[in-house]
Amino acid sequence: MGKTLARSALVLLLFLPAAAAAPALLVTVGEVTDTAAVLWVRGHSPGPIGVQYGVSGGPRRERAEIQVSLAGDFTGKLPLVALAPASRYRYTVSQGGSEVQGEFVTAPPPAAAAPVRLVWSGDLGSRAQCRHVTEGYPIFRALARYRVDFFLFVGDTIYADHACGGSDRVPGYDFVARTLPEYRAKHRYNREDAAVQAYFRSLSVYAIWDDHEVRNDFSGPSEKLTEVGRQAFLDYFPIRPPHDDPARLYRKFRWGSLLEVFILDTRQYRSPNTEPDGPAKTMLGTAQKRWLIDSVAGSTATWKVVVSSVPLSVPTGGKAHDSWSNANVLGFPEENATGFALERDAILRGFRERGVENLVFLAADVHHAELIRHHPTPEWSFHEFIAGPLSASLGRPRPLDMGLNPRSLFALGGVETFGEVSVEPAGLTVRIVDVSGAVRFTHTIGPEAGR
């Protein structure tokens, strides 16, 4: 116990900002709806942080304060309520002599058929791919060139279990996190990148964790570091779980009548990866699985987008499967495998039986980009779009799980990527964009006849 406390104190001292050189305030807005949002801040000292916000160009500015303390790593959140739908808001956050400004847009009313644009990706700061001393995280400058409504940060927002250092890397990431101060330091390191800061101040961010926020391929109930990893994640993103379920991360939000997004937590409730697949094995847990099927089936939005940090059809994992797939490296489904395909297929069957149309899954994790059309039965199909990494080891496309009858429309490895989705009444267009900002592939799908 004494060694653990001493180590925690040392890490805290190493990563606390120096009093003589207070860093810029960190700000992110998330959980935006048509009438509300959550503003997250990190200050550089304990005490109040001032917030002013209002409709861009409007005559009125609301004022509020967020109290932060050392115990919370100087982080805090402020609910923004009674906002105007389909409006651009600007805000100013200040503490001491520091001040930063940002903006975001609110969603249109639920019945409005308003166009929407989003981007998604994941996997930031793996071994040998943390912040470059001169370039930082360059993909965020490419992201900033695309004017969108929000960013979906689809897991591996940090690599807590990777040490990254060297003369060409910004110091502060060369350790494996095991304590709450260390996990927070990992998040702070990524968020302090200048390009990340600027980008996160330009729009709203919806984030979800995957495995590296805690440890590679972890399963929540059986991992002793789940609680501290989850706490640090919640400390550093503008997420406000329900009061009666303070650990809950899965959620949904609607963007007009054309789009509803369902964000899954694929870690907190999962059975150990090493267990053979079977009726009792779960990635989502009973409550989240039922919520997902009922919410997607009950949605009246034209397009239903499900965010899964791990892919449906790409086999992953070392000694055991970590994604939904039970397929081997050649794409053939295997009996007695250790994936989660039975639960995946039960969810898809629930969607099909309840007439779900215009269904898209967004994923990351595998460090390559791919656009896939699945046709598991003759009368029903859906799409899976994968993007990434933001800055991590580069992967290559691999055989897909043939149990879903997939058709790869495009695949790209060996380069950092993100995906852009544009939804209009006429259809949905997806683009894969590389780190230079170049569009590598574009594909459009039209809405099916139903809702």
Predicted regions and their residues:
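Positively charged n-region of N-terminal signal peptides that target proteins for export
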Residues: 1-7
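Bacterial N-terminal signal peptides
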Residues: 7-18
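Metal-dependent phosphoester/phosphodiester hydrolase catalytic core
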Residues: 22-451
